[in-house]
Amino acid sequence: DIADVPLIILARTDANAAKLITNDHDDNDKPFLTGERSPEGFYYVKAGIDQAISRGLAYAPYSDLIWCETATPNLEEAKKFADAIHKKFPGKLLAYNCSPSFNWKKHLNDDEIASFQQEISKMGYKFQFITLAGFHTQNIAIFELAEKYKKEGMAAYSRIQEQEFAREKDGYTSVKHQR
């Protein structure tokens, strides 16, 4: 850009699960229109991996990497998307949301969970992330602290503080919240 700031363009598609779009002007969307409209005027579409692939292919020339949002951690679906994109755009970088919305244990066993990221990396998903990881981690931590604090008082908090002190040697800096 004009300020010489590095920029990465990430194109995201939710077409795998989205059932509505705002208009019918894009030729890319036309094969997926159902012909029906919602009471609010939106257009119903056939959601699924094929529409997500279609969107990904449309985005590929204009983006640095492509993110296909998924409903479950599904290696077959991830491979189908990656293969379709790479067939026309070899080496195109892909992004994968290792989503906190997934019930990982419901869909994968422990070994599959442990190898999931390595497997999708082989497919070209080089940017892997967990949206809202901090939100979920923070909330369960404070919930557990509240339970323990109710039963044990300051002893519960003191144990957390000791963990913080012990982690300073590793680079943890939040012991001092006032600097």
Q: What feature does the model see in each segment?
A:
Residues 1-102, 106-129, 142-143, 147:
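Alpha/beta enzyme core
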Residues 110-179:
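Conserved alpha/beta catalytic core and glycan-binding cleft of carbohydrate-active enzymes
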